[in-house]
Every structure is written in C-alpha cells, then in structure tokens.
Regions:
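Canonical Radical SAM [4Fe-4S] cluster-binding loop centered on the CxxxCxxC motif
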Residues: 131-168, 179, 371
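C-terminal accessory region of radical SAM enzymes
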Residues: 310-341, 366-393
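Acidic, low-complexity/disordered tracts enriched in E/D and polar residues
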Residues: 1-68, 129-132
Length: 393
C-alpha cells in the first residue's frame, strides 16, 4: 500500500480537532467508478484516509476535516463556510483549498495506479513511522482446516483448540470496525470450508469495510458459489495456485465470467509457490496467469535454494505487467506448510508492517503481530482493543 503525508494546510489558527471517529463511503452501483473511501480521525485530530484500501493518506488536521466533508458529501459552499469560521481564513481561500483537496482525491479515485507524489504534489512519509490507533488491515484465519487429502501437519492446528462461531466472528468484525480498521482479509487454512463465509462477508459489508479472501480457489470454480460471495460484498481475492490442478485455472475463469457478466471490476491476485518440480516452467505459468486476467502476483519459494530463480521469476512477472504483492498472508497449505514457515523464520527479521500496518487473528481469536509470529497480543473476542494494540510494543 502506498503511504503518503498530505501537505494541505489552511493558513489560519489551529482549531479544536474533530472528535475521533471512523467514517466510510461506497460509491453507488450507478457510479462509473467502483470505489470506497475510509477515514479514521485519530485522537490528535490528524487522520488516516484510504482509497480503495490500497492508497493510504496520512492527513494533518485541516486535511482530515476536508476528507471528513468529502466522505459525508457536504456541499462545497457549506465546507468553505465552516472552514472559514474554524480557521479564521477568508471563505474564498477556504473554498479554493477544499476544491484543490477534492480534485486530488477525485484524481486518485478515477486514475488507476496514479502516483500521488509525482502528479498530485503529495508528500511521502516513510512506511510504518506514524503513530496509529489501529492497523490498516486485519487478517483473519477463519479456520486451519484444509480440504480432504491434505497433509495433517500442514497447519498449526495443535496450538488452536477451537474455532470461533459465526456469532463470535461477527463480534470480532464489529470490534475491528469500532477500532477504525477499514480492511479485513479472510484466510486460513482454507476459509471457503467455513459455511458462514458469505455471512461474515455480508456483516463486514454492512459496516462498510473492504473485504478480501485468500483461498486455494477450488470452491470458487463453482460460479454459483462465487456469485454468493460477490453478492455478499467480496471486494478482492487472492488465489493460491496449484498449477497441476484444473480447478485452480477454473477458479480464475469463474472470476473472469462474473467480472464480465456483472461488469464488476473485482481485483484478483494470485499466489504461486515455486518448487523444484515447477521451477523450469515458472515463466510459462506466470504468462498463463497474466492471460487469465489476474491483476497482481505473489511469489514465494518452497526451498531457499530456489531464491535466485525466484528473483528471475519476479523480473519476468514485471515484464508481464503483473505487479507484485508482498504483504498478504499466504494460507497454510500442502505447498506452504507451517514447517516451511518455522524453518524460514529462523534468523529472519519480522516484517516491518507486522503489528503496525496489519495484525493476524487465529481461528480461536488470538491476535498475533503477523502470520507465523508467535507472540500473542491478546484475544480479539475476550480482550479490549486498547489492551491488544498496546501489547504490540
């Protein structure tokens, strides 16, 4: 995610900040651009605004007020009047500054992959350096169960004695919303093995949250099942590819079908694990992924000895115009067993965003800084949010 610091600032006195809160806006179906905006007003009066859960803007107090009015669709003349009174500047100056802010946000909405720094005069802030009251994203492992036939030791099921119920997961989603977390990703194990996945997506949708699913894609090959997830509000998905299985490619075709039928620009990414068996075909697999309509690619290696070939594969993905996704958790599977994670973790530095930009919730509600980082910060169901967030250190 891009993380930016907005330089917008009215030249008047500093007014009393807005009350802390969390606000969202989703464009209506008739709008030509399918977009969502979220604004979290921090206790300091500064704010965090996300555009489609991908571009993150760190806003100063006055820019936060502009974002608040932009999301609430306040008429521009009323915005100018309020800003003029609060910051003791002329109404004309306030109107001009708000119009400039609105133009920049509209450009981010309407122009895919626009660099806000280069084109919109935003200032970039170093990732993960801002003090936040909550992360940008919550990764929820609904279950550590895997499809029949998967090796039992592939997931860390021994450390999780139970799974939360549907009602309990809804409480977790509601707590995330109350904390101001705009984005939830359901992972596992295999999240589609939970019969309540669509119901949980719908609860998040009702709260205005952006949702994603990371899955092996087997069940999504059934276009009717995928349609239930899309109807429930699914915004994006990452398919963990099993190249030797036809269902993997069928699931991508299923997304392409509904994207065309529904005229829905759902964002699809794919994860590909390089193994000794597929290393020689990796470029051909990447080409096939690119042709399927996938918008981004996540790559990993099952063996450290493959790292040089992995870098070459990343270069090939760039040539195929497939942006790389780095920070989404890859579900535990036969290709990504917990044993591989534990081996890779030895001597490895914790990802910079873990415990800051995102948190990871296990099937029993325990909160970790990130997948595979076995430091329990608390339990999302049992503990207060403030206690969990403070425990991250």
């Amino acid at each position: 995610m891009r993380r930016l610091l907005d330089r917008f600032s009215l030249k008047g006195e500093r007014a009393k900040p807005l009350e802390p809160g969390f606000y969202s806006y989703m464009a209506p179906p008739s709008h030509p651009f399918n977009y969502r905006l979220h604004l979290r007003v921090e206790p300091s009066g500064d704010g965090l605004m996300t555009v489609n859960a991908s571009t993150v803007l760190h806003l100063n107090q006055t820019a936060t007020e502009c974002a608040y009015h932009f999301i609430r669709l306040t008429p521009p003349d009323q915005v100018a009047e309020q800003l003029s009174k609060r910051y003791r500047v002329s109404k004309g100056q306030a109107a001009e500054d708000y119009a400039d802010f609105a133009r920049k946000i509209q450009a981010l909405i309407e122009t895919p992959d626009l660099d806000p720094v280069t084109y919109l005069d935003f200032e970039r802030t170093a990732p993960f350096t801002k003090q936040l009251s909550a992360p940008y994203r919550l990764d929820i492992a609904l279950t550590y169960k895997l499809p029949t036939g998967s090796p039992r030791g592939a997931t860390p099921h021994k450390r999780v004695a139970k799974e939360l119920s549907t009602g309990q997961w809804k409480q977790v989603i509601e707590k995330a919303h109350a904390a101001g977390i705009p984005h939830i990703v359901f992972t596992g194990g295999e999240p589609t093995l939970r019969a309540d996945l669509a119901e949980l997506l719908m609860r998040a949708e009702d709260l205005g949250l952006v949702t994603g699913v990371i899955t092996d894609g087997i069940k999504l090959a059934d276009t009717r099942y995928l349609k239930t997830l899309l109807d429930a509000g699914l915004d994006h998905a990452m398919i963990v590819l099993q190249p030797s299985k036809a269902q993997t490619w069928d699931s991508l075709a299923s997304f392409a079908y509904w994207r065309e039928v529904l005229n829905d620009d759902i964002f699809i990414a794919a994860h590909l694990t390089m193994t000794k068996q597929n290393a020689k075909q990796i470029n051909a697999l990447i080409d096939r992924i690119a042709e399927s309509g996938v918008r981004a690619l996540s790559l990993s290696a099952a063996d450290a000895a493959l790292e040089p070939k992995l870098q070459a594969a990343r270069d090939h993905a760039a040539m195929a115009d497939l942006p790389l996704v780095w920070d989404l958790p890859v579900p535990y599977t036969a290709l990504n067993p917990v044993s591989l994670e534990l081996k890779a973790a030895k001597g490895r530095k914790q990802p910079d965003g873990a415990g800051k930009a995102w948190l990871y919730v296990e099937p029993d509600g325990d909160v970790l800084p990130g997948q595979g980082i076995n430091k329990v910060l608390g339990n999302m169901l049992m503990d207060e949010w403030g206690k969990i967030w403070k425990s991250k250190g």
